């Protein structure tokens, strides 16, 4: 595919100023994060009322001393695990929920997701879908309810940036509650990996590791 920068164009692409790598955002591939040593205590569920968004969760987590980080730093959105639910529509019309876990400071890129599931299509997960999947608590969805072997039976795929051994704040599948120090590989598993999170300026070039431009 030929790519050339222009003020008005039909696509967004990534370019590395160091090695010259260029690709549209759908074609970018993020390598799997290396395993990390588990460095946190056992996971614990905390009452976090009125925190259905990442911003409110981070604010509450930093305002309560008992929820402070072990290293003394402040919590940020990147410490949270956001679980996004969409409906995958196959060519024959069959609909299947799909759960995607991404770091809380990133969004799922719709174009990348569409490319990843093609020829299936994607539609938004609506209120009627939550009603049909009572294991999902809107605003507080966590890995405990997800996965083909979980209580919801919903396929659960993780962003490749999420390393085995990494710890997260995420939903506890109960209204107004989140779980802290939940470790991937120790406390929960996923059904696979999907690389559909937004690509941002400053991300590592998949070719040489330098910071890319958008």
Segments the model singles out, each with a brief description of its role:
Residues 1-214:
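Extended, low-hydrophobicity, polar/charged segments
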